[in-house]
UniProtKB/Swiss-Prot annotation:
Topology class, membrane: Multi-pass membrane protein
InterPro entries: CcO_II, CcO_II-like_C, CcO_II_C, Copper_CuA, Cupredoxin, Cyt_c_oxidase_su2, Cyt_c_oxidase_su2_TM_dom, Cyt_c_oxidase_su2_TM_sf
Domain of life according to the entry: Eukaryota
Cofactor comment: Binds a dinuclear copper A center per subunit.
Record: residues binding Cu cation A1: 161, 196, 200, 207
Gene assigned in the entry: MT-CO2
A biological process term (GO) from this entry: ATP synthesis coupled electron transport
Function in brief: Component of the cytochrome c oxidase, the last enzyme in the mitochondrial electron transport chain which drives oxidative phosphorylation. The respiratory chain contains 3 multisubunit complexes succinate dehydrogenase (complex II, CII), ubiquinol-cytochrome c oxidoreductase (cytochrome b-c1 complex, complex III, CIII) and cytochrome c oxidase (complex IV, CIV), that cooperate to transfer electrons derived from NADH and succinate to molecular oxygen, creating an electrochemical gradient over the inner membrane that drives transmembrane transport and the ATP synthase.
Cofactor: Cu cation
Entry EC number(s): 7.1.1.9
Protein name: Cytochrome c oxidase subunit 2
Catalyzed chemical reaction(s): 4 Fe(II)-[cytochrome c] + O2 + 8 H(+)(in) = 4 Fe(III)-[cytochrome c] + 2 H2O + 4 H(+)(out)
Organism: Tragelaphus imberbis (Lesser kudu)
Length: 227
């Protein structure tokens, strides 16, 4: 989860988020090198007389500044496309969870079970217990098995919402009349917090998401107790 004054990303807990962090570092290095080169050229122009105001044609230079940006864009596009295909590919999910956005709460349905569904509301600040987080705790957590591929179907009952859990690299729009899907797999157990990431009305800030990733045996006990 995020902490006050945090400047970087949350710790990655899924393969997709790890890939996104690597891509961020890769792209940031390219941006840093380009910015350094531009600042160096500007400083040379301001501090030396190495300027060519009368030059009308320089095919070599034009060739360089045409080919070099194209190469840089390819270096950014290829890993980006790879991650996009990884995020869209869902092969043989072990579990499917349907998520519906409402004003202003989430409802969940485990479609592999006959009657396992519930609503998830934010716990008001006045009812929080010591150690719980303001605006992030819910009355019903989404319990899921770790180290298993899980398909999440996302839609909405009313307006646009967005189901997002940053540490898992998840952000899927909830659109009325449309069913979007994403996949998640956690590499370790724990509580993972998220929030609605699409402005959806006056209580948009009060739609937290809490995923509780547990070993498979614990998930089976929980699901049996909910049926």
């Amino acid at each position: 989860m995020a902490y006050p004054m945090q400047l970087g990303f949350q710790d990655a807990t899924s393969p997709i988020m790890e890939e996104l962090l690597h891509f961020h570092d890769h792209t940031l290095m390219i941006v840093f090198l380009i910015s350094s080169l531009v600042l160096y050229i500007i400083s040379l122009m301001l501090t030396t007389k190495l300027t060519h105001t009368s030059t009308m044609d320089a095919q070599e230079v034009e060739t360089v500044w045409t080919i070099l940006p194209a190469v840089i864009l390819i270096m950014i596009a290829l890993p980006s496309l790879r991650i996009l295909y990884m995020m869209d590919e869902i092969n043989n999910p072990s579990l499917t969870v349907k998520t519906m956005g409402h004003q202003w709460y989430w409802s969940y349905e485990y479609t592999d079970y006959e009657d396992l569904s519930f609503d998830s509301y934010m716990i008001p600040t006045s009812e929080l217990k010591p150690g719980e987080l303001r605006l992030l705790e819910v009355d019903n957590r989404v319990v899921l098995p770790m180290e298993m591929t899980i398909r999440v179907l996302v839609s909405s009952e009313d307006v646009l919402h967005s189901w997002a859990v940053p540490s898992l690299g998840l952000k899927t729009d909830a659109i009325p009349g449309r069913l979007n899907q994403t996949t998640l797999m956690s590499s370790r157990p724990g509580l993972y917090y998220g929030q609605c990431s699409e402005i959806c009305g006056s209580n948009h800030s009060f739609m937290p998401i809490v995923l509780e990733l547990v070993p498979l045996k614990h998930f089976e006990k929980w699901s049996a107790s909910m049926l």
